[in-house]
Every structure is written in structure tokens, then in C-alpha cells.
């Protein structure tokens, strides 16, 4: 996706579809969704046209990164990854925190190819979480089975939650400690 025309690739064995559009416009987002369906990776190298005013350039880069993040939320299935370029600055922590809430982990990567004075970095978010629970949630669950390690197993909308120190047949209130793309861990609340 680019606002400018993208030259087609010469290799017919590599199917690449290009979209000329502006990621901040709904019609472009719809074109992406229609073309891709579900993805394993969303990679955004977008950057604003720089003005030389650091705070403005940073804010505009965060806005573009958020647009890519929103597209990723629509396109990525469980376990999918996001890589997004952004300029370092005061709004980076808020953006990173928002992304962390949707992925197993997020890292800042500063490419070696960037100039030493560059504020450019990439947020690399791994393993999209689509679970119906999040870390810190307190919920009541029914223990429906026992796992190989002896933990109780609860099912929430098809999602497996391992609960320590309980047995099948119990109904307990738990606090979710850790969430992975396909399963999570919780402890009973006394």
C-alpha cells in the first residue's frame, strides 16, 4: 500500500498485489481487508513527510503507526505478528502500551542501517492475542477437566485456561496471570 504508484514486480512466481491509497482513508483499509482476508504478518514501513520539526514529525509517525496497528487488529489471526516503524518521542510509550495489550510481547528494534542520529525504530509485536481473557482479569470459571500436570482446565469461549490447585467439577473465581495465543494460566482467588 502506498499513496504513490508502485511498480509491479517482474517475478510471476511471487504473487504481490499492490494498492494505491492512503492508509488513513477507510476505502484503503477496506481494499486491504478485501485483498488479504486474514494475515500472519502486518509490516508497516510508513513514515510521514518530515517537516524538520521533531515533535510534529514524531506525532505524525505515531499516527501512521496507530493506523497500521488498527489494520493489524482487523487482519491478524491468533499468533500473528506486527512490525511497525515509528519515530522515538514522548508518545512512543503510550503506543507501545496499547500494542502490548494485544500481543504476547513487544520489542523496540533500532536498525543498524539507521543513522546514529536517527530517531527511527521499529516496534516488533509477536503473537497476536485473540483470547477472551486478558492478564489481570478476575472471572468465575468451572473446572471441566484435569491436565497432564494436574492443573484444572477451564474453557472460556473455546479458550483453555489452566488453573492450579483445583479439581474437575469445582467452580472457582480466578485471576488470570498469563495469556498466550492458544491458552492461559490463572490462580484461584482465596
Regions found by a protein language model. Name each.
Residues 1-190:
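SAM-dependent transferase fold signal centered on methyltransferase-like domains
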